[in-house]
Amino acid sequence: MQTIALAVIGGTGVYTLSQFDDVQVYEVETLYGRPSGPIRVGMLFGQRVAFFARHGEEHALPPHKINYRANIAALQQLGVSRVLALNTVGGINEAFGPRTLVCPDQLIDYTWGRVSTFCEEVGSEVLHVDFGHPYSPLLRGCLLRAARDVDVSLVEYGCYGVTQGPRLETIAEIDRLRRDGCDLVGMTGMPEAALAREKGLEYACLGIVSNWAAGCGDGAEITMGEILSNVATAFSCLPELISKVARE
């Protein structure tokens, strides 16, 4: 197989890549089971890119039921070394309103009960990986440069609070996240980032703010219609940005 320049993991509302040509579909089996769906490899503005939808192509997998280990292992089996994760998130900080694109540099994990490491098999090596900077500085740098080159507005920092889901958070829970220093809230950032680190992959997050978190902004009720509409609007500029990252 030809070298894959970049793998993209699609989040809520992102189930395919537009302008994706010469696509081949791979059904990958791993030691940890099957990934969320088939992995599609094709050309995006001249760059060879892999893509799959984290929640499945029909959005059938809630955040706590995603086989994160199989997803990361499948990408590694295809020879992927760089992963750009698209995460649909809610805005807590007033600078992170709906339709904002964000490249977070930190996260806090509030999830529980998810299989969060590859170090579980008998005889496997125990890895105490450095996770002080949970996102690859190298790939984050590529993303930030690419955004400037294609004139895409991107917030260049942020702390992503990862909650269990699938329900949205209470106002009190969001107040707690704010006090903890979180700018964004979502449900799929972990254990994905940590598993990628264990496998030695360069991994970065591109957050798509779909709505204000509970009690933030105008305080209106959050609906799936609002979330999907805002993701679609924000995503319109991303194929060119993704191809630019792949080219870096």
Swiss-Prot record:
Site features described as Important for substrate specificity, chain residue numbers: E169, M224
Similarity comment text for this entry: Belongs to the PNP/MTAP phosphorylase family. MTAP subfamily.
Physiological role: Catalyzes the reversible phosphorylation of S-methyl-5'-thioinosine (MTI) to hypoxanthine and 5-methylthioribose-1-phosphate. Involved in the breakdown of S-methyl-5'-thioadenosine (MTA), a major by-product of polyamine biosynthesis. Catabolism of (MTA) occurs via deamination to MTI and phosphorolysis to hypoxanthine.
Reactions catalysed, as given in the entry: S-methyl-5'-thioinosine + phosphate = 5-(methylsulfanyl)-alpha-D-ribose 1-phosphate + hypoxanthine
CDD domains: MTAP_SsMTAPII_like_MTIP
SUPFAM superfamilies tied to this protein: Purine and uridine phosphorylases
Signal peptide (UniProt feature, chain positions): none
Entry's EC annotation: 2.4.2.44
Native source species: Xylella fastidiosa (strain Temecula1 / ATCC 700964)
Protein name: Probable S-methyl-5'-thioinosine phosphorylase
Residue ranges the record marks as coiled coil: none
TM ranges: none
GO MF terms held by the record: S-methyl-5-thioadenosine phosphorylase activity
Keywords associated with the record: Glycosyltransferase, Purine salvage, Transferase
One cellular component term from this protein's GO annotations in UniProt: cytosol
